[in-house]
Design a protein with these regions (language model features):
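Start-of-domain marker
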Residues: 20-83
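Alpha-helical junction/boundary sensor with strong preference for TPR arrays
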Residues: 42, 49, 65, 89, ...
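Bacterial Sec-dependent N-terminal signal peptides
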Residues: 1-28
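Extended amphipathic alpha-helical interaction segments
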Residues: 101-201, 208
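TPR/TPR-like (Sel1-like) alpha-helical repeat modules
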Residues: 76-99, 166-181, 208-231
Length: 242
């Protein structure tokens, strides 16, 4: 019996060491800036049953793709590397049931970086009047946040811009139901806060476009306790007050 237990223990230790050896290989490849190899190894690992729900492997796959998207690699298989990196980051969050992975500093920092890059994409498209393209990124943001209220408001605002007034009204109704549950934003990331602020401003703009000014004012009022010191929010708020 002791021999059986000893053999079982040896195999368990070998499997454990093998697991971390593969993590180490991903880390080493990443440190060497061999991002395509990181992607290929992580993708191969996910095909194995023991890794397919492993948040750490999705982290390396996402981060590898994110770096490839910034590297200028024009290979066809990496054409959508940025979007794919976000998809896999979303899978990391979904598989991180206990929230342990996201507590790791390096993973949390990466999440914040990706969120910030998405917000910049959204703001750039909105600033050039391309709300249709911004809407695609707004939908994508939902995959990488635990605080989607800003995303919900902006998604509804996008429907007004697409002349889908009934969809916009319905979207704002759902979003405002969720907004009523928001008691504070201390757990929001900086990107979450920016999305929330933008959602309030453009959601109010949506109401104004159908001449429901009082609803626009009421929506902005709901966010005033958190954003009254913000210049952009205050400008929109004062505009509605006139």
């Amino acid at each position: 019996m002791k021999k059986i237990l000893l053999v079982a223990s040896i195999f368990a230790t070998m499997a454990f060491n093998s697991l971390f050896a593969q993590y180490d290989e991903l880390r080493i490849l990443f440190a060497d800036q061999k991002y395509e190899k990181v992607v290929k190894l992580a993708d191969k690992m996910i095909g194995d049953d023991k890794f397919k729900k492993d948040p750490m492997v999705y982290y390396w796959l996402s981060k590898g793709l994110y770096k490839v998207s910034q590297s200028g690699n024009t290979a066809p298989e990496y054409k959508n590397a940025y979007k794919e990196s976000i998809n896999h980051l979303g899978k990391l969050l979904r598989n991180d049931k206990e929230g342990e992975a996201i507590q790791e500093d390096e993973i949390n920092e990466y999440l914040l970086e990706v969120q910030g890059s998405l917000v910049e994409q959204i703001k750039n498209e909105i600033s050039t009047g391309n709300f249709r393209k911004a809407s695609s990124w707004i939908l994508t943001y939902k995959k990488v946040t635990k605080n989607p209220i800003g995303q919900m408001l902006l998604e509804a605002a996008g429907k007004f811009k697409a002349d889908d007034k009934s969809g916009g009204i319905a979207g704002l109704k759902v979003a405002e139901t969720e907004l009523a549950k928001v008691k504070d934003i201390k757990d929001f990331t900086e990107a979450d806060k920016e999305m929330f602020k933008l959602g309030l401003i453009w959601g109010a703009e949506g109401y104004t476009s159908i001449r429901q000014v009082e609803k626009a004012k009421a929506l902005l009022e709901k966010g005033s306790e958190w954003f009254r010191q913000d210049e952009d929010f205050q400008e929109a708020y004062n505009k509605m007050a006139r």
